[in-house]
Amino acid sequence: MKADSSSSSSMSSRMRLRNSHGVGSSSQDWSPFSRHRYSALSSQEDYRSEESEEFGPVFIQEPDDAIFSLDSDDKKIIMNCEARGNPVPTYSWLINGTNVDTEADFRYSLIDGNLIIHNASEVIDYGRYQCRAENSIGIVLSRDALLQFAYLGPFSGKTRGAVSVREGQGVVLMCAPPSHSPEIIYSWVFNELPSFVAEDSRRFISQETGNLYIPKVQPSDVGSYVCQVKNTVTNARVLSPPTPLTLKTDGVMGEYEPKIEAHFPQTVLAAKGVTVRLECFALGNPVPTITWRKMSGNIPKKARLRKSQAVLEIPNIQLEDSGSYECKAENTRGGTAFRGHLQVYTLPQWISMINDTQLDSGEQLRWECRATGKPRPTYRWLRNGEPLSTQSRVEMVNGELTIHRLQQADSGMYQCIAENKYGAIYSSAELKILASAPMFNNNPVRLIATVGKDVSLECRPRASPKPRISWRKNDRRLQPSRRIMLLRNNTLRIINSSRSDEGSYVCRAENQFGSAELTTVLLVKEPMRVELSPLRVEVTVGESVVLSCKVTHDPSLDVSFLWLLNNQPLNTQQDGGHFEYIQTQSSTADLMIRSILLKHAGKYGCRAQTSTDSVLAEAELLVRGPPGPPGVVIVEEITASTATLSWSHGVDNHSPITTYNVQARSPVSLGWQTVKTDPDPVTGSMESAMAVDLNPWVEYEFRVVATNSIGTGDPSPPSRAVRTKEAVPSVAPANVRGGNGRRHELVISWEPVSEEYQNGEGFGYIVAFRVNGTRGWKEKMVTSADSTTYKYRDETFPPLTPFEVRVGVYNNKGDGPFSEVVTVFSAEGEPREPPSEVQAFAVSSSEIKVLWKPPSPGLGRPQGYEVSFWKDVEQEELGKKKRTLGNETNMLLSGLDGNTQYLVSVKGFNSAGQGPSSTAVKISTKKNAPSLPPGNLMWIQEGNNVSLSWDPVKARDNESEVIGYKVLLRQEGRGHSQVMRTPNSAVVLTLPEGGTYIIEVRAVSEGGEGAASAQVRVLTSSGVRAKNGQLSVQNSPPGLAWTALFLSLMVPSFPL
């Protein structure tokens, strides 16, 4: 929208987007006179700041295009429409431009703005619908929505004749679809469902005509064909009558050139953004091949070929995809082509829309709306839903509306419509013509100023048209001067005010509708003075200080204080309680700073404020503390053991730096370590030093820490990592030793030298050894820096031969030192004799105890023993082995099968290998424990004594005989159980304390324990205990007579 130059300021300030708010800004003009006649509306928020303010209808929801299925059980259609406005809008509807009479036609009803259509009929209700929203401000029309009806009629029941062709000839089977709406999808059934025709280079189904094309018929094509159509909305399907396809018997069709039978239209219209599918298929023998090209330019890269190249598919079509496309069909007999034009259109889209506007009567309105589209849109204008016609005051040119000399009757709702042949879009706005007498909201006004300061007296009446403004003081008309100015916005500006400016100022506003006055009483007070002490103070970290702020001001005014640090408000509630605000009198305010930190240094401000004045006084706080971090460390030069470093001074925090400490870190060090320097010490005036006694070929980082009389500060950022130069190794391996190994081996081991002391690349070890009493050394190179062992084998070595051994180091720079000479013995031999007196005893059905004696002392002493055991019916290789942890001479074998004979042998072993096995001994495990649990548990309780009995358990033939019973007792909620043994099938228990106890019984045999009985739960009296706090047991005689009380038992299931 544009505005004439004569009124652009007023118009732009009062034009508002209906869906968003714009905020304007203005700059002051210090000219003493102003001719500006309008009061500006700052934003739409001002315009509609209250719910009570009236405004025209604004659509929240407009009707959308809809497709209704005639097969739907619910014959009701709802077209939605909703608008906001004040007063609340009322609604009506148009169908194809004609009003819908909801009172005369019972099929139509309105719920709020929604139109309900009952018993919908395609004949009556098909068309374009518009919603009309109306209130006292005006009328707006929605976009139009197309209502269509989806249906699919039946095929004609007429029998279709057979199609007879020669083999090799082409054929087109016609679908002749029934009436339908909207689009349908075609497919063909061959002979019977669900056998559908598969499309390939020899079969094509056109989605434009529905016909089936077969360029070269083969015997396998003979059969019955049925066309199936499917509605894309309702998913309804119908089948055509069958069309038989037969072969003639008068010969085979020869080759013939292609003939295009299915192709896209010569002109294809497509909306921007949709997917376009161009069809092209030909008959011919041999079967033709299809190729595509774009006549001007290349086919879009996004395009895809479908159905054996018979369909060119272009997704998300754009304007640049327009043009002529050609499909070509070729075979060995010739070729043919078809060419058509693809034209892409776009619906109108807004570039600029119209906005709500309010203007004074007599002014000029100029609205402009602009839209893009292909074809280019044309424009129409509506006022209150009716076409706006050109008059002497009204001009409409290319989307621009101009109304001269606005009148109150021009108020209302306006709509700009941009449309082309494919669609239309609407932009709505309200035009409000203002006409009111001046009015002031607040009257009178009391204003207080300070001597020597400027003061502004505002005059902002609400009026339309803009009123004329005049000022007077104490009933005398004010004349502008160098010190008193009337600004363009009607504000009275007084420069350098004094007590003589006090008085009553009256602003008078008047227009043709009336007048109003605003009285402002101006009082001028003496300025305020603020003293802050001390103005500059130095403290040390950890100390405290108090800043005192005193103010002198007019006693009739209240004063408030605000403390600032470096021009930012100070929050005394934060920062760990370092700040405390203290005010003992209305004119003083103190700030206490406790346990001062370096970050508390800076400029502190005390701002005193009254309703007329604001004064700031500032003081500087200097904090002495440890130095700040030095600048980043730079490595100037590096050698094998030194590094020359430089850095820059950090802040000294008001206490001179006395010394620097140089630190280094390497991948093998424990964090940062202080290093020796030259010079030593490094004084605070220096910015370089040499780190000495570094290890060669180690990657170091360096940093520097400064110290002053207050303390040590934070370290500098670390230097880049640098590696010292290589040097000959200087550290020999430690803890050289040896021994063990296999027969005829000499095993030498050592602790590896850490990377920190390898001093260069190519690090390795030199292992030197000789038999005691000989002169020459044998030397072997070990090239791995991580190696810890070297083995030397010589068949001539007797076991335990003593050797003198030493281990040295080397790297690419040369050989380093050797370790001290130590004596190392060669390996002894594997055991020569087997263990003797091997015995085995059955412990239970699953355990065997094995005992033996070690072989006679001598070379090849065992370091441990290996026991092998296997079933008598198995081979030894299938058995198991188990080793002792040391030189034990017994072992318990468990996890064995019951009542089974095993063979057991023992052999010794040491680091040299295994010795011979002993002779195998045979041993049988005991029979399995009884599988049946004790049954028929009965009990009698007298106090804390419980008499318990059960039926004896009888062992089966393959089970061990019962030799007694084990009674297990535990208190509920505890894991520990007490165990009692008895040879009888009855016991008397004295329970140790009150509570609930769980009792179960197991049979005991040589084969182990049997299955558990059902659990018995017994509740004893609280507080009753046995004398010694332990469970006491009395065995009952076998013939004891029982009077039994059965409990609720927890009975597990057992196999019989």
UniProtKB/Swiss-Prot annotation:
A lipid is attached at residue 1035 (GPI-anchor amidated asparagine). Residues 22-31 have a biased composition (Polar residues). InterPro entries: FN3_dom (IPR003961), FN3_sf (IPR036116), Ig-like_dom (IPR007110), Ig-like_dom_sf (IPR036179), Ig-like_fold (IPR013783), Ig_I-set (IPR013098), Ig_sub (IPR003599), Ig_sub2 (IPR003598). Gene3D superfamilies: Immunoglobulins. Residues 57-142, 154-240, 258-343, 348-432, 438-519, 527-622 form the Ig-like C2-type domain. Keywords: Cell adhesion, Cell membrane, Disulfide bond, Glycoprotein, GPI-anchor, Immunoglobulin domain, Lipoprotein, Membrane, Repeat, Signal. Residues 1-14 have a biased composition (Low complexity). It is a lipid-anchor; GPI-anchor. It is found in: Cell membrane. Residues 629-727, 732-829, 834-928, 933-1023 form the Fibronectin type-III domain. The keyword Nucleotide-binding does not apply. Belongs to the immunoglobulin superfamily. Contactin family. This is Contactin-5. It comes from Danio rerio (Zebrafish). The gene is cntn5.
